[in-house]
């Protein structure tokens, strides 16, 4: 039996540590340094703008309701209920795996070239493409540009608006990486799952989901129906990358070390300590208003993630148990062969 005095001392040190952490987050961010960094570094400004959009846009209850009304919930939950369950906390992992399957196989489609709405032609019958500005109607749905093709069969113009409005994507149900990640992030949020939008500077995006069962952030890519395979980009696709940044409701974090296992591109557009400072400042701003207990919980989770991302850290038993096999399919699954080759994502 543990001597009560040791329990008392342990509780005292834990309380002091908790108070220390809480006070850290209550310290004001040096705004002069933030403003100077945003003025002098273009990349810092880009991250700041993305944080303003991506950290809050999916917190929309009306959108969540629209997603749940559109998806086949009976089918999704029936499939989840058939999956093996070691612990109640594993249920959300199974739900995410089923959402990945459902989204890729039953709901959303990949668009190499759009289908002609006039005659239904597709593939080699569709030629182009020029880039045009959106029409007034297309612009209503946060459309930045439109790919315009020509149908050889019926001589019609075929338009592929690159919509950024996830509710419009719920209607069109087609797109490429950006559209897939955009809507799937909203799908995860609609099911009450903690999720991040992961942005890669070399033109790819995916998600992460916080697993209560594994107690860590899990890589999730709806294009590939991939769960907990962070190695696929640098290993399987042979993709070269520089920065991977995660955005979510309560933070901005550099997760590059989780994904860039080889083919590291130079990281020279912002000083490393400036990037760390900016992420910390943006995270502090997002956590304004949290209770002391919530702030402490987030800090502890952040701390564990940094141990995971730090390659020099000694792995815990839990980390060793959760090691994943860095094998699998060579190259990317989604997209045409020509498109994947042009992006350096075909595994060669």
From Swiss-Prot:
Zn(2+) binds at residues 116, 119, 151, 154. Substrate binds at residue 224. Residues 311-348 are annotated as: Disordered. GO terms for cellular component: cytosol; nucleus; PNGase complex. GO terms for biological process: protein quality control for misfolded or incompletely synthesized proteins; ubiquitin-dependent glycoprotein ERAD pathway. Its cofactor is Zn(2+). Keywords: Cytoplasm, Hydrolase, Metal-binding, Zinc. Its EC number is 3.5.1.52. Residues 338-348 have a biased composition (Basic and acidic residues). This is Peptide-N(4)-(N-acetyl-beta-glucosaminyl)asparagine amidase. Specifically deglycosylates the denatured form of N-linked glycoproteins in the cytoplasm and assists their proteasome-mediated degradation. Cleaves the beta-aspartyl-glucosamine (GlcNAc) of the glycan and the amide side chain of Asn, converting Asn to Asp. Prefers proteins containing high-mannose over those bearing complex type oligosaccharides. Can recognize misfolded proteins in the endoplasmic reticulum that are exported to the cytosol to be destroyed and deglycosylate them, while it has no activity toward native proteins. The active site is at 177 (nucleophile), 204, 221. GO terms for molecular function: metal ion binding; peptide-N4-(N-acetyl-beta-glucosaminyl)asparagine amidase activity. Binds 1 zinc ion per subunit. It catalyses: Hydrolysis of an N(4)-(acetyl-beta-D-glucosaminyl)asparagine residue in which the glucosamine residue may be further glycosylated, to yield a (substituted) N-acetyl-beta-D-glucosaminylamine and a peptide containing an aspartate residue. Pfam families: Transglut_core. It comes from Candida glabrata (strain ATCC 2001 / BCRC 20586 / JCM 3761 / NBRC 0622 / NRRL Y-65 / CBS 138). Belongs to the transglutaminase-like superfamily. PNGase family. It is found in: Cytoplasm.
């Amino acid at each position: 039996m543990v001597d009560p005095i040791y329990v008392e001392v342990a509780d005292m040190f834990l309380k002091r540590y908790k108070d220390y952490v809480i006070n850290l987050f209550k310290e004001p961010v040096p705004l002069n340094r933030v403003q100077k960094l945003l003025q002098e570094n273009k990349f810092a400004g880009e991250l700041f703008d993305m944080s303003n959009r991506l950290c809050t846009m999916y917190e929309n209850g009306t959108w969540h309701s629209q997603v749940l009304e559109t998806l086949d919930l009976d089918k999704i939950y029936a499939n989840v209920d058939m999956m093996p369950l070691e612990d109640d906390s594993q249920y959300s992992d199974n739900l995410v795996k089923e959402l990945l399957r459902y989204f890729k196989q039953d709901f959303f489609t990949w668009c190499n070239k759009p289908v002609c709405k006039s005659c239904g032609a597709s593939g080699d019958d569709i030629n182009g493409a020029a880039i045009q500005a959106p029409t007034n109607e297309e612009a209503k749905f946060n459309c930045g540009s439109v790919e315009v093709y020509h149908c050889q069969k019926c001589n019609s113009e075929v338009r592929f608006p690159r919509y950024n409005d996830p509710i419009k994507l719920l209607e069109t149900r087609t797109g490429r990486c950006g559209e897939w990640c955009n809507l799937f992030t909203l799908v995860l949020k609609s099911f009450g799952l903690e999720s991040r939008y992961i942005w890669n500077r070399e033109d790819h995006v995916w998600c992460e989901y916080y697993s209560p069962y594994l107690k860590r952030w899990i890589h999730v890519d709806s294009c590939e129906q991939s769960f907990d395979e962070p190695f696929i980009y640098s290993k399987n696709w042979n993709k070269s990358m520089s920065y991977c940044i995660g955005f979510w409701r309560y933070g901005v974090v550099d997760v590059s070390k989780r994904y860039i296992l080889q083919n590291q591109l130079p990281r020279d557009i912002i000083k490393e300590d400036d990037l760390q400072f900016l992420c910390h400042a943006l995270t502090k701003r997002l956590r304004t208003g949290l209770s002391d207990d919530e702030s402490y919980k987030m800090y502890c989770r952040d701390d564990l993630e940094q141990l995971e991302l730090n390659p020099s850290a000694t792995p815990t038993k839990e980390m060793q148990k959760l090691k994943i096999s860095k094998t699998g399919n060579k190259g990317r699954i989604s997209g045409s062969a020509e498109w994947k080759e042009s992006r350096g994502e075909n595994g060669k």
